[in-house]
Structures are given as C-alpha cells and as structure tokens.
C-alpha cells in the first residue's frame, strides 16, 4: 500500500482541511465525518423523492442527532487499510469530544485531533500539526519526511529572491560527488529567523539568529547572506537548503521543508541523545514533544490558540512593567515574595499586573509571578506527552533564566539547554537535508 491512507472522522470540515491533506500527498481513504459518505440515487427513477430521502437518511448522522456507533464499526473494519486518523471537531460542538476520547483510548491507529471554528481561515498552527502528524506516519512507514517546496515566483518576490532561486539550481549543477557537502537549515519563526550550516561530517560550520520582521521572505534572504559570510562560503557551495517554521513555505530558495516539530526532535537528539521530553516556547506558540531512544517524535501537543505563555506574552508583560525583555529574567531572580498571576489570558493578565503595580508590589516579585504562571502552563502541556526525563528546553524563552529556574523547581529536574536554544529547529532541518543526500 503506497502513500498515506487517512481516515477523516468527526464533524464535517471545510474544504480547506481536505485540501491540506491531499496537498501533502495523503489520500482520504475513508471519510467518516457527519454527512461524509455520499449516497447515490437514480435521477431517472419514478420514485425520485423516496430515493432522494433514502440517500439522505443513509448518510452518517451528526452526533447531535443520532448515535455514531455505525461509523466506529466501519472504522474498525478498515483498520488494516488505514495509516492514521484525523479527527475534526468544531468549536463549541462538544458532543464530538466523547467519541474522540473513546477512539483515542480504543483504536490501535495514530490519531490527531484538530479543532476549527467553521470559518474560511485555516491557521498556520493547524497546518503545522497536520504536517507533523503526516510526517510521523511517513517515518513509521520508512518514507521520506521532506516535502518539496513549490517555487512559484509571485509578484511579491524581489529580484534578489528570484536570483537566490536561480542560484539554487546552479548549486545543484556545481556540486559533484567530489565537492564538499554543505547543507543549510533555516527556521522561519514568528519572532526570529534562525539558520545552521552543516558539513558532510554532521559538524556545525556556522549559525545565525536574526529578527523576522514584517516579511519572512526578506528575513530569510538576510540570514542567508549573513550565515554564508560567517561560514566563508558562496551560495553555490550549498548542496541543499531545508526550511522549517511557520514561514517555511515562504522561502522560495529552499529545496524542501519539514515541520518544526520534527526538526526540534531531530536537533535535540543530535545535541543530546538522552533527551526524551522537549519544551519549546517560541514567539506565538509553545509545544511539548516526546522522543523515543532513536530520536523519533512519538507524541506532541501544541498550545496555539492564543499567545498565553509564549514569548509574545512575556514581551507584553515586560512592556507593562516598563522593563526590557532581556532584563525580565534576571530581575525575577531577586524576588522575595511569591505572587500569583491567576489569569493566563494576555489581556486579563495585564490587568492583574497593573493592579499589582497599583498596590506597590515589587517589580521583581511581579516578574516572578509571571514566570510561575508560564511554568505552570508549560508543565501542564508536558504532562500530556509524559514527563519522561531527560528534559530539554528550546526557543527564545529558554534564554530567560527566571522561567528556566521556576521550571526546574517544578519539574524537580534540570533542563538541558544548548548554547543557542533558538537554532535547534534549524539544526534539525539541516540534519534532515543531510540525511537525504548522504
């Protein structure tokens, strides 16, 4: 059975979800969403109305209207022909949570739950989770996890970017089996853009971190120029470029892309093979990832519905306290009083902080309370994948000593943090590219 075969289950999704699945080289073999299985009827029948009514009644029902036990039996019958289940729910349609829970507990198949709000928008977070799930299924089948980039040069691409795309093709021609191998991984995040170059011996030649700014494509071009200068290399020396992060599909000179979840797992295992649980807190989301002894991602969860507990949240709190974000961590280490920030909503938490300022509480104590709230949310996320040591923290928030200290106290275990925790995703992307060509 070639390719990935997916069962789409749950509430009826919009066309965007189905399109995302098929765009990523997976087939919806079984559509068990409500009204998902379409029944045909004879248009020429003299009994067209009864035939039409029969077709409607034969559709899988919405769980609010009738029991969905029949589709569970269908799913069991197809289990040997399906690689995984994508379970879709609609926000506030809580009845589907019961079926998902039962499937999660009883099914032998990997299952991913995604929730949408029935609008036309399909966020980057859903794309990331969906791609990471499909990548994990491909890894289980021994298939390549790299996804080819579509180099459609739109009117938004600058002349420099188009030149970089041309340079990619020239690099392929220039590199022969005798030439040194250099692979670049680039992680285009919401806050920072990070890059790593590896040589053919899996050694880090150079790395770089810059602010993403308003356009991910332009920051990618800037970091390409910066890291090539650091490595004393030319563009034609690069054998392959692999992108990751939220902006991975917006980098036209990248050859292939992988999700940041897979890349963080690969990068973490390279830096420390003993790592089993990763906490990644970036600019707009946080993730907990579980690895096996081979470094494969076995489970992951994301907090991606709001900025609570992320780098953006910390930046907002720092502005409220009139403290530079780089000073917030060291400042919290001077705390002498435990203050609880009860709300993790950025707006409500800011109101709490303003109230604490009005009560003349010490800034260091408020900062410590903010870090305590972030740590509590992060550990709750980690518990969902299993708190198996050793633990590693990645992302820009790993540079905050206040958050790290509170996390280690609550975990009762040390966190492994690399010298530059923001490049772990880019490192993983480079490793995937290197494995693909060696």
Tell where the protein language model's regions lie, with residue ranges.
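Redox- and metal-dependent alpha/beta enzyme cores, enriched for Fe-S-associated oxidoreductases
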Residues: 9-73
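Adenine-nucleotide phosphate-binding core of ATP-dependent small-molecule kinases
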Residues: 71, 349-382, 422
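Conserved phosphate-binding/catalytic loops in two-lobed NTP-binding clefts
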Residues: 109-115, 260-261, 408-427
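Glycine-rich phosphate-binding/hydrolytic loop that grips phosphoryl groups
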Residues: 128, 314, 418-438
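N-terminal glycine/serine-rich phosphate-binding loop of ATP-dependent small-molecule kinases
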Residues: 156-260, 399, 408-409, 413-415
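Conserved phosphate-binding catalytic cores of ATP/NTP-utilizing and phosphoryl-transfer enzymes
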Residues: 158, 163, 167-178, 246-296, ...
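Glycine-rich phosphate-binding loop plus the immediately following alpha-helix
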Residues: 212-216, 293, 298-333, 337, ...
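Glycine-rich phosphate-binding loops at beta-strand->alpha-helix junctions
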Residues: 246, 383, 387-410, 421-425
């Amino acid at each position: 059975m070639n390719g990935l075969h997916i069962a789409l289950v749950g509430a009826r999704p919009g066309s965007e979800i189905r399109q995302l699945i098929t765009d990523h080289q997976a087939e919806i073999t079984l559509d068990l969403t409500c009204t998902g299985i379409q029944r045909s009827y004879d248009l020429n029948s003299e009994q067209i109305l009864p035939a039409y009514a029969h077709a409607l009644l034969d559709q899988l029902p919405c769980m609010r209207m009738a029991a969905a036990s029949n589709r569970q039996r269908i799913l069991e019958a197809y289990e040997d022909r399906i690689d995984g289940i994508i379970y879709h729910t609609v926000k506030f349609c809580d009845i589907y949570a019961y079926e998902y829970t039962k499937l999660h507990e009883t099914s032998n198949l990997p299952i991913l739950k995604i929730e949408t709000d029935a609008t036309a928008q399909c966020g980057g977070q859903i794309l990331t989770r969906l791609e990471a799930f499909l990548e994990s299924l491909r890894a289980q089948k021994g298939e390549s996890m790299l996804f080819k980039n579509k180099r459609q040069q739109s009117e938004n691409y600058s002349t420099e970017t188009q030149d970089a795309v041309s340079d990619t093709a020239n690099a392929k021609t220039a590199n022969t089996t005798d030439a040194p191998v250099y692979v670049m991984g680039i992680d285009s995040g919401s806050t920072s853009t990070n890059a790593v170059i590896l040589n053919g011996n899996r050694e880090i030649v150079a790395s770089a971190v810059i602010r993403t700014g308003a356009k991910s494509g332009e920051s990618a071009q800037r970091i390409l120029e910066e890291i090539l200068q650091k490595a004393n290399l030319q563009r034609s020396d690069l054998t392959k470029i692999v992108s990751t992060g939220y902006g991975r599909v917006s980098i036209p000179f990248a050859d292939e892309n992988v999700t940041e979840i897979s890349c963080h797992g690969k990068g973490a295992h390279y830096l420390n093979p003993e790592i089993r649980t990763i906490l990644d807190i970036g600019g707009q989301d946080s993730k907990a990832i579980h690895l096996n002894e081979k470094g494969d991602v076995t489970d992951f969860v994301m907090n991606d519905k709001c900025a609570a507990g992320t780098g953006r949240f910390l930046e907002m709190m720092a502005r409220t306290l009139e403290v530079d974000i780089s000073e917030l961590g060291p400042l919290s280490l001077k705390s002498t009083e435990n203050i609880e920030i009860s709300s993790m909503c950025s707006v409500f938490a800011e109101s709490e902080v303003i109230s604490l300022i009005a009560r003349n509480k010490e800034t260091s104590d408020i900062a410590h309370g903010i870090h305590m709230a972030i740590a509590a949310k992060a550990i709750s996320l980690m518990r969902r994948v299993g708190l198996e040591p050793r633990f590693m923290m990645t992302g820009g928030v790993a540079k905050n000593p206040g958050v790290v200290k509170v996390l280690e106290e609550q975990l009762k275990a040390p966190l492994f943090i690399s010298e530059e925790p923001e490049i772990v995703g880019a490192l993983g992307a480079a490793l995937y590219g290197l494995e693909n060509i060696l």
